């Protein structure tokens, strides 16, 4: 997960898309503290931050030598400030990755519309950003542009080449890649089928809107590894506005299920306010979101389970699987993607049998594939053994990828089996988790919407600490198996 910081003149004007004509004197975040921003990211589980170094209005948060429309012309630090330098230093000290957002659309620069001149201008500013501020791990290229604006041809592939030359480890995001792609909405909503495999030639960068489903779902027959990114703001707008309130912690948890839990990267925008700090109400929500994740996912209810597999590579085609074999089914209880269960080759049935050793109540399934070996599974389901010895399907899905989270009505059972129905190659599973989430409404996860919660963070944590049998936050039917 990454944090997005939308910050600039819009923070002081109440606008989302600035005109490019607002005077720089309005920019004066007197208490700006980049260390505070980075600390907030790190303690809440976000290992990367991205700053809007230049948004559509053209105002630069660093003292660019190619324009006067920057912090150099503002009263902040008497024109000597550099937001990106402050953020870079804080990120390096904390071990947090840094990314930059440089808007292609520029409403201030007069040469915008002149293809050759503006592309030269853009490359010059990109060079500044990629050579002054240490290691840059992410470059975010926004495809937004207002109607009626000047025609402009962007030299995307020239930009990509420059980025890879100056920052070889940087991931480049645009609507269609080349390294990560947009999921197609700003709700934090990933597709229920999501392949990290893609064919960018089928969706040119400017043509993603012609086939939004392809962009969201990816392509099992694709030739490139281009994972999907889900971006969403903690507030109604992308920039801070004093009249707006943040989403609730449960809202963010629902988004987590539908983004990270659907093989997507979550980029959550938390905009600094006009003083240069993250607002207290946003901090409270982030802390609540973190506590929710920890309380639900910190203990795998299957951690002490007995496991068997329909087959295990290197042990023949029969059911079983020892604890110490290289591809043991017990590998799915170890965190990390470099240990995994692998079935014998050329099998037509792939099943993991799970004995929890006692009756356990749960409503969340977590699965992971070792993606360094590619994304393989295209159909799976989980079954639980009924008390009259009848197997009953609990949930099912299509793709897994780096992580899949499925929520369903509460189940109580001891014996489970994970059945892989279809796979592009022999399926490999690196992790399997079973959890109890007592606060999220199952129907909101099943439906592709983000609901407004009536619980605040304090109430949520209180609910989680109660016995699950007394929790009244879910309207889902309980399946007693």
Segments (PLM) and residue ranges:
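Intrinsically disordered, low-complexity segments enriched in Ser/Pro/Gly/Ala and basic residues
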Residues: 191, 195, 199-200, 452, ...
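Mature catalytic domains of secreted/periplasmic carbohydrate-active enzymes
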Residues: 1-348, 353-376, 384-386, 390-398, ...
